[in-house]
A protein has these predicted regions:
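His-Asp-centered metal-binding catalytic motifs of divalent-metal-dependent phosphohydrolases/nucleases
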Residues: 18-41, 101, 206-224, 312
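Divalent-cation-assisted or electrostatically stabilized phosphate/pyrophosphate-binding catalytic cores
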Residues: 46-68, 95, 176-178, 228-254, ...
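Metal-dependent nucleotide-binding catalytic modules
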Residues: 133-144, 169-171, 175-176, 240-244, ...
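Active-site flanking loop/helix segments enriched in acidic
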Residues: 45, 159-181
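Long, well-ordered mid-to-C-terminal structural blocks that present hydrophobic/aromatic surfaces
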Residues: 190-230, 235-242
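Histidine/acidic-rich helix-loop-helix segments that form or flank divalent-metal centers
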Residues: 68-153, 199, 203, 208-209, ...
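Alpha-helical phosphate/pyrophosphate-handling elements in metalloenzyme active cores
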Residues: 1-24, 171-207, 291-293
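Aromatic- and histidine-enriched alpha-helix N-cap/loop-to-helix transition segments
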Residues: 1-2, 29, 95-100, 177-184, ...
Length: 362
């Protein structure tokens, strides 16, 4: 989804404001993630062959598997998920997602290719990936990334989070990457935004998703500094945050076009504060009630930072509980899970009963 964001921004710059349906892009990414969680561990060539010949049956299987999990979500969202696969159309957003998928595949494949170019059939795999990317070469973002310069540098740095482990000092199963965590927070924030009891404007949905997707981006430069360390010395948390902001401005933002910097800062700075934009200024600390009553309009760019924070903690709680349930646990892991649970037990935040959600996963 990071690559899809970059491609979509370039495409929007080329074709004009409104040319990219960002909600369709975000939901398409979530739909494809859900689809592949059911049809996991299938090699891409096999997967595409299966979808071509038995797509209807496979999609029906996916819908049945996810029916219980999606129960309670917005009914229109559930229908859009089904329509995405049953009424397949070659929209710009789908092409962007496909291009992003193949570029991500190429990025991972290069690591293997340079390590073991002698593997049987590896050159054919390389050719297949390159052919798929060529089919999307008309997208200006694809061309920019393939230049291997600044845009590729940004994606390459983000890609490193694919190999950066969460809770690296504590043995856990399953292990989770920082990049995977970022997507889970983004997708969950988006789903929660639809369930807040008010119809969120499209910019609010957009901001809550991408703030989740980029909220841990500075960790590519500072690594995963765990909360106990941040809180062990008074003022250390502020020092780390200042350093992250400095590194963002010096290392990451220069890799992106200047017009994008404002959005990227909006996503990654003070990310756990409710905020809006008014008269070209960012206003922090806006209450959930005020966002709903006064600022739930695209012109104010509302962002629910408090929601993002609790979803981030929920993701950490689930990561810990999954490992404990698998029998891989430690005193530190159990204590972390219990502390997070007690922090949100019985609380309702941004219109959502998170106490009930935490209790479900306990």
């Amino acid at each position: 989804m990071v690559i899809a964001y970059v491609i979509a921004r370039f495409e929007e710059e080329r074709m004009g404001q409104g040319s990219v349906d960002w909600i369709a892009l975000i939901e398409g990414g979530i739909f494809e993630f859900l689809h592949r969680t059911v049809l996991t561990d299938i090699k891409p060539p096999v997967f595409h062959r299966m979808m071509k010949e038995k797509g209807y049956e496979l999609n029906k299987h996916v819908f049945e598997k996810l029916e219980m999990d999606m129960d309670g979500l917005d009914k229109n969202f559930q229908q859009r998920f089904k329509d995405y696969y049953l009424k397949s159309t070659n929209t710009l957003e789908r092409r962007i997602l496909r291009a992003a998928h193949y570029l991500a595949t190429q990025w991972e494949f290069k690591i293997i290719y340079h390590t073991a170019p002698f593997i049987y059939g590896i050159d054919k795999t390389k050719e297949n990936i390159e052919n798929q990317i060529e089919d999307h070469y008309d997208l200006i973002g694809v061309q920019k990334i393939l230049l291997g310069k600044k845009s590729f540098g940004f994606i390459d740095l983000c890609g490193q989070l694919r190999f950066q482990k969460r809770w690296a000092h504590i043995p856990r199963i399953p292990e989770t990457s920082v990049l995977g965590h970022m997507f889970i927070v983004a997708a969950t924030s988006y789903l929660c935004t639809m369930e807040m009891g008010i119809e969120a404007c499209s910019k609010r949905l957009y901001n809550n998703f991408y703030a989740g997707l980029f909220h841990d981006l500075p960790e590519v430069l500072t690594k995963d500094i765990i909360s106990p360390v941040k809180g062990s010395v008074e003022g250390l948390k502020d020092i780390i945050k200042d350093y992250e902001d400095f590194q963002m401005n010096e290392e990451l933002l220069p890799l992106l076009p200047r017009p994008w910097h404002e959005d990227m800062k909006y996503f990654s700075e003070s990310e756990f504060n409710n905020k809006i934009k008014k008269n070209q200024k960012v206003l922090l600390g806006i209450s959930f009630h005020d966002i709903n009553e006064k600022y739930n309009k695209n012109e104010y760019h509302p962002l629910d930072g408090e929601l993002l924070h609790v979803v981030d903690r929920l993701a950490a709680f689930i990561e810990a509980k999954l490992s404990i349930d698998h029998g891989i646990k430690s005193e530190e892991l159990e204590k972390a899970a219990e502390n997070i649970f007690q922090e949100y037990n019985g609380l309702k935040i941004s219109g959502i009963d998170f106490g009930r959600i935490f209790n479900y996963f306990r």
